[in-house]
Amino acid sequence: MASNLGSSNYRYQVGGSLPVNAPTYISRAADKLLYQSLLVGEYCYVLNSRQMGKSSLRIQTMNRLRSAGIVCAEIELSGIGSQQITPQQWYGGLIQELVSGFDLDIDLLAWLCDHAHLSPVKCLGEFISTVLLEQIQQRIVIFIDEIDSTLSLSFPADDFFALIRNCYEQRANKPQFRRLTFVLLGVATPSNLIQNKASAIPFNIGQAIDLEGFKLSECAPLIAGLTGFSPHPQAIIEEVLYWTRGRPFLTQKLCRMVANQLQKRSDLDVSVDEEKQLVKTLVKTQIIDHWESQDEPEHLRTIRDRLLYSEQSRALLLLYQQILAGKQLLANNELTQFELRLTGLVSKVGGELVVANPIYHNIFNQAWVDQQLSVQPSPAESVYRTSGVSDLWDRLIEDSN
């Protein structure tokens, strides 16, 4: 969904990946870090909550790398499938994506038949070594998006991640592997992605890329979209960022709402306070009030569902409750903290966990948390329900009647 401002056709895009030439794309510190890391051949991973701009970052970075003479391709794992798919089909799908993405000249069916004696992961490794790196002599970057879809596979993806690490380790003895770099993107914790914790994983050899909210100094493209419709475009964006803390989806959405209102206005003789009040009113009436019915495209419900349908939902709620109450909690790599951050509900600021923005604070407030905890089973009840004791007790009661 997009909003057009007058004849300039300026677009605030809400949801989805922004194209390369999108006028409202905001370049952040992550853009620079990812690009520079890939230029020197570092493996990278971008693990963050949904709608933080991962896919748009990938598109922009691929464009810059191609301009620098680096050959790139992306694999969206969700497109290969994860439900009722065998290892042979999944790894075969990866190979097919490489053939398509790099436009490789190969009779793939014949090649797969010739290598049918290999395990699926070994087959992929052999393809990378003898086909991809042979046909493409330039530097190569493979972006693997939606890496969290591996969690839905009926088989462990440990071998896949071990293969990626092995490609890195082969740089020591095989110079051609120094031309190959991977980028992993998705919504998951490294520990969740790996079932065998003793496995060699790529996350401790790569560069982590953190996606932070937009800062005012980065927002010239957003300000430009309001110029001509308000005498105070920067003040409006400042107020937008106060409410969204620069979260990409919410920021683009609120900018679109403001733009639509400004287009209806004929009088430009307004004060800064009036412009800020307009933003505040839109936040209250079109985002916070009746939020579940107004949440289109879906954003807030995604946060809610990731929090409530997690296996450790109660632990996440209790941790969030402490943050909501203002307790100082130092951010660390503990699993519950990482899971809570992946909901998008909290972020790391100055080394501490805080509620990500005032919109979330108003919607997912203390009353909401109390309500959710009241219907969550206690730890003892969870054990009782999952241990089979409950069913046995119910049958004994039924038999005695």
How should these model regions be labeled?
Residues 100-158, 163-165, 169-181:
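Mid-core helix/loop region of P-loop NTP-binding domains shared across ATPases and GTPases
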Residues 2-28, 107-110, 201-204, 300, ...:
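Conserved adenine-nucleotide phosphate-binding loops and their immediately adjacent elements
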